[in-house]
Amino acid sequence: MAGIVWGDVESFGVHYDMSHLRPAVHQVVTKSGMLSIEITFGFHVFTDEKGNGKPIRHKMERRYFCQNRYEGSKTLTERILGAVDGDYVTAFIAGTSGQRYYHLNLHDDFILMEIRKPSGTDGFLRLHVVSAYTLDQWGEVPRGKNLPFEFVLSQRAAGTNRL
C-alpha cells in the first residue's frame, strides 16, 4: 500500500491518535462498475501555518499541529466515500506546478485531492487527500470545471487524464 502511516502526535500534553489517517482501500460502486480506491492523507490534513500547535516537520516543511483540522480529519474517509454518489468535484490545474487536483466542497469544508490510476491496474485508483479544512468567510476555492464525483472516478479508472 502506498501513502504515509502517520504516527500519533503529542501536542501540549495531549495525545492525538492518528490511526484514522492510515492508508486504506475501500470499495465503491460506480455506473461503470466496482472500483477499489486507496485513500491516503497528506501532512496538511492535520497541520496549518498558524502556529497554535506543536511544530511538526515533514520532509523539508515545517507546520503546526492543528486541533481543528485533526478533528475534521476523523470523518474525511466517510465524507469522501459518501460524496461519490451525487456530489460534485471541481477539477483544476495548479498554476505553479501544472498538477491536476480536485476539490470537493461539502457544506463549509474544502477537501483537496489528487486522483491517480497506477499503471498496470484495472478497477483501482489512488486518492490522496492533500489538504482538508473548513473555509472561513473569506476563504476562496480554486476555479475549475464542476463534474460529478462518480463520473470523475470512472473516467480516471478508465485511464482518462484530461478531467
Feature locations, PLM:
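Ribonuclease/tRNase effector modules and their secretory precursors
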Residues: 1-163
